[in-house]
Swiss-Prot record:
This is Malonate-semialdehyde dehydrogenase 3. InterPro entries: Ald_DH/histidinol_DH (IPR016161), Ald_DH_C (IPR016163), Ald_DH_CS_CYS (IPR016160), Ald_DH_N (IPR016162), Aldehyde_DH_dom (IPR015590), MeMal-semiAld_DH (IPR010061), MSDH_GmP_bac (IPR023510). Its EC number is 1.2.1.27. SUPFAM superfamilies: ALDH-like (SSF53720). It comes from Geobacillus kaustophilus (strain HTA426).
Amino acid sequence: MTETKTLKNFIGGQWVASTSGKEEVVPNPATGEVLAKVPLSSREELDAAVAAAKEAFREWRKVPVPRRARILFRYQQLLVEHWDELARLVTLENGKVYEDAYGEVQRGIECVEFAAGIPTLMMGQQLPDIATDIESGMYRYPLGVVAGITPFNFPMMVPCWMFPLAIACGNTFVLKPSERTPMLANRLAELFTEAGLPPGVLNIVHGAHEVVGGILEHKDIKAVSFVGSQPVAEYVYKTAAAHGKRVQALAGAKNHSIVMPDADLDMAVTNIINAAFGSAGERCMACSVVVAVGDIADELVRRLKEAADRIQIGNGLDKGVFLGPVIRESHKERTIKYIEIGEKEGALLVRDGRRDSATSGQGYFIGPTIFDHVKPGMTIWTDEIFAPVLSVVRARDLDEAIEIANRSEFANGACIYTDSAKAIRQFREEIDAGMLGVNVAVPAPMAFFPFSGYKNSFYGDLHANGRDGVEFYTRKKMVTARYQ
């Protein structure tokens, strides 16, 4: 029997075994098989990573921007060459089906491509002759050592939001990946090193609460980017800000899709099924609430159930599978409790994912679950379940549908299905969410646009990706000069 390997930290360009003596297993969510062990590193090990990043920053900040861009271009090429390998690794440790994982790798590669355009992104501004023989200009500079804390649900894409752009801007980086999906982060570091990244520019420290606390409080870390649940995001924001750090903390969601009476129901149902049950509903842009407007509700619910009944559940590496497992047995149990709560609070359980055959074997499976006649204020409407559970709320008209969506404490994304330009305009102007979709399944923007929403879905001022990302990872210097 082969011994399960324990992952190492990546500090100062070296793979270093943790000395904490604490670790957790990393199971395959589809089978329960142990893939690896992940160390729960100590504060001292984090300190070593920050020290390595601080030392590397002294030289990395001086590397010409075009040379940094060439390393990013080479990194992008290596990611493309290893696309299939990376997608399979995502499926193994996260559980999402291969097609979803393949698309996630594509999104990560797009983030690296965006970061490779750093010569243009780092350009400042200049105004000649603000007075006689005097000109003024703005220049961008890196912050120093920055850190990222990433979630389990996108082990490829979310880290690639963070460290490629931060490093391209001239910073050095400390990454704390999710202890539930830590394997891909190590592979990303290996490929970045192969691309020519100098030692200490990217560091990885595996762990949990102790490492997170150290990141938020460390005096040499200038900025923290976080993606995760709402309570933790709020804690990260408040704690890091109290220690003088720049913070962006992307949090939870309860995304509503409004289906109007004139909607193309075939398209709407296909999109909603993909958005609600793709990646087992474990994504912050998942559709978790459908607002059916007018007299289409019964037909819409019937079609949603029929489509959900056709979904194949199983191991994400098997052909034809659409829905893989959730991340852990504890998450499956949590989802089952929410289904029980939905029934107790009076929602109509149209499709019960607890009864699907795949849920009784090994792995952490829960089938597609649909509730109808859900009322705003019910627990399954209020809470982010983060699982393949879809709630259908009924509304008289668009005004009521928008009012229902805007009552949520979250404001990440929202969609509308309609051919009415008037309805689309009203939706765009009145809905309180950061990322909007019109007749699309998941309105997640490309890497060159900012990502995230409002209210309890985001804490901070500058969002991830796009120009916001460059602003987050740089500071400005204004220079006014007189020429004599």
